[in-house]
C-alpha cells in the first residue's frame, strides 16, 4: 500500500509555494506553484514524489532544486504552510483579514494623497475643464493604482484563479445585459477587492459590499470635492439613462478604450451591482492578482510590441495592419470643441485619467467662453496635435518618441465623427491647418455639422493608418490660417492621396509619385505594359559590354533570325546600348523570344523598342531642358515640337559641330545605320530622325519625331516609289557584297585544301618505304580532302556571278513574253510537221532560265496537275527557305540534283514546269537520246519536296534518284528505281547517302532558323 501525500489546504499551499519560489526562480511564481502542486498531487509514494519533483523542477530552479524540494516536503509534513489558526472559523478569518488589509490600504492612500497633489500640481494647469477637486481625486486614485502595481510581492500569494478566462467571458457576456463596467483604469484597490468579495459570497453579502462601494465618488460627479462623500445626486440631463441599458465595461472588458475622453462637465454615470449569476460561490475569498494593463496601450491606444507584450491589452485589442508607418505624412488633428452633452440614445464615453506626457500642450480653445476652471489663454495659439486618419484624436509626439499616440489622456477633446462607410477624414498639413472653428469668411466649412458622438461598434473599428515617425512638436503659428491652405482627403481603405497646390514655401514630404526613382525608363518592372502590334520591328539592347557592342558581333548573332534593316551601336548615347531593326515583325519576335543568350552573355537584355523612348529621354535630359528652365513647367504632352526637339541649330556653329552635322563620319557610330556606314546615304528629306545641335554643349542629339515622319510622308508622297527603288537597290548591293565575301572565303578554303592535297601526294610519292599504317592514314586523309574539294568547287561554281548576271538583264515581263512566244512557235511547227529540234532546245533553255528566276508558274503547260498542294514553296521536312536570308547563307552539302527517267518524248516539254512548282531550279540537263534528265534545285529542301511529291506525272510514275557527283558514291541501289512514291520517300530520308557528309561543317554554316 503506497502512502499518499496528505494536503489539507491546496490554496494555502499554493500561496506558500508562490512566496517561496519568487526569490529563487525567474519564471512566474504563481504558474510554477500550480505546476508544483500538480506534481505533489500525484498518487505516488513520498520517495517517488521527491525524485519526480527534483527531476521536473531542475529546469526552473537548477541549484536550488534540492533545497526547495526538501523544504516543500517538510512544509507538507509539518503543515507549516498553513496560516496560524487564530480565528475561530475560516470564514471569519478571511473576512477579518481582508477588512484589516483594506483599512491599512485606505490609511496609506489618505497619507499619500497630498503627495500626489504636490507631485502633479504642474500638470493641473493642463487639466480638462472640470472640477479641480474631482480631477485631483481621479488623478491621485489613478496614480495610487500605478504605484500599487509595483508592489508585486504583496499579491504573489493571490495568483489568478483557473477560471479567470471563464470570468472574463462571463463579464463580456454581461455587457449585453444589465451590468455596467467602467472603461477607465481609475478603479481603486478597495473596489477591486469588493468585486472579488462579491463573487465569493451570497447575494446579501454582495448588497452589503455594494453599499460600501457607493462610498467611492462616482465617475462624473463634478460638484463634490470629498471623494468619500455618499450624497451623490445626478445632475446630467441624461442621468436617467440607466447603466443597464448602456453598459460601460470594466477594466477587463472586451472593448478596448481607444476612443477620445469624456465630454461635458455634467456627464454622469451610475454604478450597478453585479448580477447574481456573476457571483462565484465556490471561489476563494482572497482577491485575485489581475494581469497588469499595458501602459502604452492605455495611454496611446496601441502598443508596438503587439502580441509579444506581457501586459494586458483587453479582450478586443486594436490590430495595426502592415502599413508603412514611417513613410506616411504627418497629419495634424481637428481642434477640440467644448459643446454640450452627448445626444440621448448614446452612452457617455468614459474618461481616461492617466496623466498626460510632460511635453503635452493644451489644444487651442474654440471661440466662446472658457470654463471657469480653466485659466485664460493668452498669446498665439499653439499648434494642434496630429489627427490620425481613423478620426481619433492624438497628442503631439515627444522628441524621443518614434510613433505618435492615438488617444490623448486627461484633456477635454472633441469626439470623433460617426464613421461613414469609408472612413475618411479631412485634415491639413503642418503650418497650414485651419482651426475649423467658426470661420466668418467660409462658414460652410465649419465643424458644426459633424456629429459630436459616435457609439463604438466592434465591426466598424477603423484601421490605424497614417502613423508616422519624427518630431511633431511644431512651433506656434504666428499667422492666421490662409484660404489657400493645402487640404488632403485620405481614404483609409483605398489609401489614395490627392495633393493640391499649397502656399509657396511650405515644405512637405515627397509622396510616392514625386520620388525620383518613380517610373524610371530603365526599370522595366514598374512600367505600364505596352501591347506591341505587328508593326514593331525594332529591338533595343541594354547592358552590352563595350567589347561586344560592335556591328560585326551583333550582325553575326542577329542575322540568323532574319534580315537586318538597321543596326546602331552605342544607341542613344549609351555605350552599352544598341538598336536592331529587322525586316519583319516575325523575325524580331523570333529574335527576342530566343532562349539563347545574346553573344553568349546572359547579362545582355533585349527589349522591344518604344518609339517614344528617345523623345522621353531627350525631354528629361537636363541639357535639352536647359533653355526652358525660366518658363513655367508644363506637362510633356502640351509642349510643342520645337520644345521637345530642343534649340534650333544656328547657322554659325562651331567647327566641330559643323563637321558632325554635315558629314556622316564612321566614328559617329551611335547615329548611323548600316546603309549609311556602307556609303548608301538616303535623302535627308525623308529621314525619320532630325539632328538637333546644342551650341552650349557641342553635342548632337538624334531625336525620333513621328510627327515629322508623318508630315514628310504627306508632303513627299510623290517621290516614295523612287525611294523604295533606292532602298531595294541598296539591299541588293548589300546582299551581293555579302555573297562575294562568302565566295571569297570558300575560295580560300578550297586553295588550302588543294595545297594540303598536293603536299600529301608528294609525300606519298617521295617516301616509298613508308609503313602501311601511315600510308593508310594518309590515304584516308586524302579521300576526305578530295570530297571537301569537290563540294567546295561545286558551291563556288553555283554561286559564281557569271552564270546569272548576263541573263538577269531581261525583265520578268520580257522573259514571260519570250517564253510564251517560243512555246507558241513550237506548237505551230509541230502541228505543221516541221523540224523543231533547234526550237525545242531554245524553248528548254528559256524554261530553265525562267525556272531559275522563279518566273515559271506551276499552272503552265498542258494540263499540269497541282495535286492540291497550293503554293510551290515551303514544302519539305519543315526546313523552309529561311525568312529573308539570302540563298548563299545556306550551305548544305547533300545532293540537290535529281535523276529523272521513265518519261516519254511527248512529256519532255512539260517535265521542267512540273518540277519547277516545287522550288527554284538551278540547272536542267535533258538527254534526248536516252530520255534521261538531271534537274538541280537550289536547296536540298526543295529537291526533297520534288522527290516526294513529283514522282507522279501525267498519270504515270517517274523513276527518281539522287544524282551523286563522286564516282565511288554513285552506286544506286536497285530499290531506288522502284516507282513507289512511299518507298522513295523513305529512302530519300533514311538512306545512308544523306548522312555521309560532315555534320559539324553543316551545323557551322547552315542557317539555324529551323531550330527556333
From Swiss-Prot:
Region (Disordered) residue spans: 106-236, 334-404, 465-520, 647-667, 858-889, 970-1012
List the biased-composition ranges (Basic residues). 169-186, 862-882
Enter cross-link residues for Glycyl lysine isopeptide (Lys-Gly) (interchain with G-Cter in SUMO1): 106
Zinc-finger as UniProt keyword: yes
Record's compositionally biased regions (Low complexity): 394-404
User: Which parts of the sequence are C3H1-type zinc fingers?
Assistant: 288-316
InterPro entries recorded: Nucleotide-bd_a/b_plait_sf, PWI_dom, RBD_domain_sf, RBM26-like_RRM2, RBM26/27, RBM26_RRM1, RRM_dom, Znf_CCCH
Q: Where is the composition biased (Pro residues)?
A: 334-388
Q: Which residues carry this modification: Phosphoserine?
A: 127, 501, 523, 621
MF term (GO), any: zinc ion binding
Q: Which residues form a coiled coil?
A: 98-127, 724-800, 828-852
Q: Where is the composition biased (Acidic residues)?
A: 973-1005
Residue ranges occupied by any RRM domain in the UniProt entry = 537-611, 896-965
Instruction: Tell me the keywords, alphabetical order.
Output: Acetylation, Coiled coil, Isopeptide bond, Metal-binding, Phosphoprotein, Repeat, RNA-binding, Ubl conjugation, Zinc, Zinc-finger
Protein's job: May be involved in the turnover of nuclear polyadenylated (pA+) RNA.
Protein's recorded name: RNA-binding protein 26
The source organism is Mus musculus (Mouse)
